A protein has these predicted regions:
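N-terminal secretory/targeting leader peptides
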Residues: 1-43, 51-196
């Protein structure tokens, strides 16, 4: 697991998204995607000008980590479904791969959610282990072939109007960098967010 490996210093850095650490730190879900929450512009305004960055760094420092926001994904699709969805009733009993706080919403309406890694989604659809999935933006989902099995796609994603991805750096390694090196990492990631 990236979180523990970077935190312990087994590796210097890793790439992920904060929502995967919700079991360890529930508050970090607000640094990845919030159902019915802010779009990318609003999230970035809070992150840069509303204290979000400092709060994120404070939370992670307790775990010997330094986060750097490196990617912002615009709205994802609400999912790819084998069967057409016409009402909330159609979600009851649906087996679906779902991420983060959105999974809690889907569970409340009667779906049965599970979190699968990206590479496990297509085989799970193919085998019928899941009936539907959400994962990323439609362009990424299409590259992964979800449409070949789950023909019905709904957009935009209410559960992830914007998604932040992070570069996790071991805090001891981060602190050992020069101010110039830190600025280079921050600038590179900022450029990635802006130009995606």
């Amino acid at each position: 697991e990236i979180f523990d490996a970077v935190s312990s210093g087994a590796v210097d850095a890793g790439w992920s998204t904060a929502g995967y650490w919700a079991g360890k730190i529930p508050a970090v879900q607000f640094f990845t995607a919030i159902p019915f929450g802010p779009n990318a512009t609003e999230f970035l305004a809070w992150y840069h000008e509303g204290g979000g960055k400092e709060l994120w760094e404070e939370i992670y420092a307790r775990h010997n980590l330094h986060p750097v926001q490196c990617v912002m994904i615009s709205p994802e699709s609400s999912g790819w479904f084998r069967e057409e969805i016409n009402s909330v009733e159609d979600l009851k009993g649906l087996k679906m791969r779902f991420f983060g706080l959105g999974a809690k919403v889907m569970d409340k309406v009667g779906a049965s959610t599970q979190l699968l890694a990206g590479g496990d989604i297509y085989p799970a659809l193919e085998l019928g282990t899941i009936d539907a999935t959400e994962f990323a933006m439609p362009s990424i989902d299409i590259d992964l072939g979800f449409y070949q099995i789950a023909k019905h796609n709904y957009f935009p994603g209410w559960h992830q109007p914007a998604s932040a991805l992070e570069l996790l750096i071991n805090l001891d390694k981060w602190n050992a960098l020069s101010e110039t090196q830190k600025a280079q990492v921050e600038a590179t990631c900022s450029e990635s967010v802006v130009k995606g």
